[in-house]
Amino acid sequence: KEIRSLEIGNGASRVSTLGFVRRELVRQQQAMGKKKGVVMDGRDIGTVVFPDAEFKIFLTASPEVRAQRRFEELQAKGTPVSYENTLANVRERDERDTTRAESPLRKATDAIELDNSRVTITEQLQWAMNMFNKITKQNE
């Protein structure tokens, strides 16, 4: 639960701008994924950590939708925060992560994009499973 706190998210984004931190994290993530069948989430997983992964999903949503989701999540935890500050935080983090020199956030050319702004979690899972089955059948 603590990993989803505002402070942890912001701290991770700031620390991720440091090259030596990014390189060590990539090394550790790659070690965890040596055996196939791993599912990882992160802003550079498909481009830097596992550029040769067989199946990549690039999830996206508008900053406003992501801010609303984050705002509701933080409010449910009792964290005093405004929607406006949450939206500003989402935009700042996106800017920092897309412009950092080491492992910037970008979509892998072979990733399948899903804009989940107006899609339920159940619909996202069904879509992902359908795409996975389609791709794995093509690779057999």
Residue ranges of model-derived segments:
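ATP-dependent small-molecule kinase phosphotransfer cores
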Residues: K1-G37, E64, Q68, Y83-A101, ...
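NTP-dependent small-molecule kinase module
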Residues: I3, G9, F71-K77, R96, ...
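Active-site segments that bind and position negatively charged phosphate/pyrophosphate groups
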Residues: R14, V49, F55
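Conserved catalytic network of the ASCE P-loop NTPase/AAA+ motor domain
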Residues: Q30-G33, V48-P51, T79, P104-K107
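Short, well-ordered beta-strand core segments
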Residues: V38, E54-F58, A111-E113
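Short glycine-rich anion-binding loops that position phosphate/pyrophosphate groups of nucleotides
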Residues: D44-G46, P63-E64, V119
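Conserved RecA-like helicase motor core of SF1/SF2 enzymes
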Residues: D52, L59-A67
